[in-house]
Amino acid sequence: MAKLSKVDIAILTVLRDDAKLTNEQIGQRVGRSGSAVSRRVAELEKDGTIAGYRAEIDAQQVGLLTVIFKLVNLHGHSRDLTDPFEAALQSWPNVIEWCRLEGHWDYLLKFLVTDTVQGDRLHDKLLALSMVKSAQGLRVLDKPRTKPLPLDGLGST
């Protein structure tokens, strides 16, 4: 984990809210020169704090109308099961997020699909994996709401 200064946090906050701004524009907002911002952004990219830049696409506008979360249990927790399971998830375009869990369930998956029929097909495909013991689905009823990363209060002087 990189040690972040107050200026780093200010730069990250501006980029989080609008990654299309120039270094000069960011500098105006954080009280630094464009070249100083450029150097700092390059360091934040190099150390992995800035993991990338991407467009935020509205899933519903491109026809991905249904969000489904899946809770999954595997037959065990060894790498012989988890590695091929995660490789399968990586190869499925409609699985956009997953994480391992502590507790009753082993994984939480997030699917974006065109409709419940496509969601049912993915559920069947999931259950066909030999390492999957069980899965339970939760269909989201309305558009998920997201908030930006909470950067307030982070960083040193």
Regions found by a protein language model. Give the residues of each.
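A compositional/biophysical signature of low hydrophobicity enriched in polar/charged and small residues
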Residues: 1-157
